[in-house]
Amino acid sequence: MGDYLVKALGFEGKVRAYALKATEMVNEAVRRQDTWPTASAALGRTMMAGTMMAAMLKGDAKLTVKVEGDGPIGAIIVDSQANGQTRGYVKNPHVHFELNEHGKLDVARAVGTNGSLSVVKDIGLRDHFTGSVPLVSGELGEDFTYYFVSSEQTPSSVGVGVLVNPDNSVLAAGGFVLQLMPGADDAIISEIEKRLQTIPPISKLVEAGMPPEEILAALLGDDNVKILEKMPIEFACQCSKERIARAIISLGKDEIRAMIEEDGGAETTCHFCNEVYLFSKEELETLYEEA
């Protein structure tokens, strides 16, 4: 089965849980961005966290995650929709370091430990919800955990992991979010904490073929999980030539005239999917008339 996300409840509704397998989604972003392994892990972790956060929304709602650390990869931007479609990019994709002391890709060194994680939610209202927290580790799972606790006042645990092949393709990518609901007592908390301390890295579980449902069972206990929904997830970009044309029109007549006279056309590349859009001199003349 391809990539998908599972929504569930645990401990009779006292825990809200999400888990996903996102190997293909992350690999498509890596392929389009030509990221090197450490940057791939950072981008993939952020995309999976964004995908699970968006799955908490309803209908046509969407969100944007922005991670801005002081590390060499620069900003990570992810757009996720409630329907399971996500896109993302990293400003400097060609960043890679040796493995850290734990034998893992050194995401914190690439992202940096000083900076911010911000989330903008668009739920169809006039005003968007915006939350921002400082980075606490740069490893990203811990940073999203802190975001939920600090910005949304929801005690949570976030795990996201990416394994990268020697040829830079993605071997496995997966993640989970566990959130305590009102009524979760100390016994539930200690049970979850005990399981979190003993479970292998989530990327290893995905590599071994463990589906999201079984990952949640391992995190919460077989008898404590009630699956609510499964939904497919994918890398998807909403860019189009029409959308780029509207952006060119918004630049105004002077800018468009300069493109026509100085360049004889225009070429633009989407940050997210690296699709290249070309506009001929004649097409720009038409846009000039509409501006």
Curated annotation (Swiss-Prot):
Keywords: Chaperone, Cytoplasm, Disulfide bond, Redox-active center, Zinc. GO terms for molecular function: protein folding chaperone; unfolded protein binding. It comes from the Bacteria. One of its GO terms (biological process) is protein refolding. Signal peptide: none annotated. It is found in: Cytoplasm. Disulfide bonds join C237-C239, C270-C273. InterPro entries: Heat_shock_Hsp33 (IPR000397), Heat_shock_Hsp33_C (IPR016154), Heat_shock_Hsp33_N (IPR016153). Redox regulated molecular chaperone. Protects both thermally unfolding and oxidatively damaged proteins from irreversible aggregation. Plays an important role in the bacterial defense system toward oxidative stress. Belongs to the HSP33 family. This is 33 kDa chaperonin. The lineage of its organism: Bacteria, Bacillati, Bacillota, Bacilli, Bacillales.
